[in-house]
Amino acid sequence: MLEDSYLQLARTILEHGTYKDDRTGTGTYSVFGYQMRFDLSQGFPLLTTKKVPFGLIKSELLWFLHGDTNIQYLLQHHNHIWDEWAFKNWVTSADYDGPDMTNFEHRRLDDPDFAPIYQAQMQTFDDQILTDDAFAAKYGNLGDVYGAQWRHWQTRQGKTIDQIANVIEMIKTHPDSRRLIVSAWNPEDVPNMALPPCHTLFQFYVADGKLSCQLYQRSGDVFLGVPFNIASYALLTHLIAKETGLAVGEFVHTLGDAHIYTNHVEQVKTQLTRQPRPAPQLTLSGAHDSIFDYQMSDIKLSGYDPAPAIKAPVAI
């Protein structure tokens, strides 16, 4: 099955992973330098051993491709993946006069009395982002994260580089180039990002009329994050292949620190008891000339019949 390589990664970490402390204070079991390969001609690699919300993957990728760094677009599409990082901008500002949100990242999980207070403040924050453009401009921006680096890389001369447009043009005109690369890791901008890029660099490769993509990911949350990353870059490969007139080849996923958080171990064990199901199929509709013209409704899956979702806390 298409997701076997992902399941083997999870088993490898449980069996051989090294325990490490981490930035979030949660603790992880991790391995270093792991590679998975997915043949995109065999189906779309969205996990079936648990339900993964494809709508969130679509809206986040389109957000990146728009060059957007403000969560307002995500909230308009009911996507809350990045909420906590923007929320922190607000609750640590001089404008915030609500309940104490110090260390909300852990208190929301560990303190049952605090959890509803946090949820109420987060709802207030989301509502204001959606209805107040000035508030959204001030507190909804995450800094120079993926969209900024992909579409508006800042040069020393004060100009910008559109890496996505450039790499698409290079695939069309110089498909054998070894420079079909997009980087999200800009050392100068890392301090100004809500979260430094986890998926840092990707490269395309054209052979036999097929487009393949390899991602280097410095850090991968294997239970929650990596399934999203696999599907997101598979979708990106499909979108660029369609614009460049190519079939899809492989998605190659290379991970630096691949880890399972200690509070995800039982969930991973549950997932590993399940049998993979047939992979869904991706359909891209609409006669779009550019990857930047796609809307949510243009991207559809068929035949997705996953096992039930498995909940787990996000480490912030």
Curated annotation (Swiss-Prot):
Gene Ontology CC entries for this record: cytosol
Q: Where's it found, cell-wise?
A: Cytoplasm
Annotated protein name in UniProt: Thymidylate synthase
Give the originating organism: Lactiplantibacillus plantarum (strain ATCC BAA-793 / NCIMB 8826 / WCFS1) (Lactobacillus plantarum)
Which residues constitute the catalytic centre?
A: 198 (nucleophile)
| One Gene Ontology molecular-function label | thymidylate synthase activity
**Pathway(s) it belongs to:** Pyrimidine metabolism; dTTP biosynthesis
* CDD domains tied to this protein: TS_Pyrimidine_HMase (cd00351)
Coiled coil start-end? none
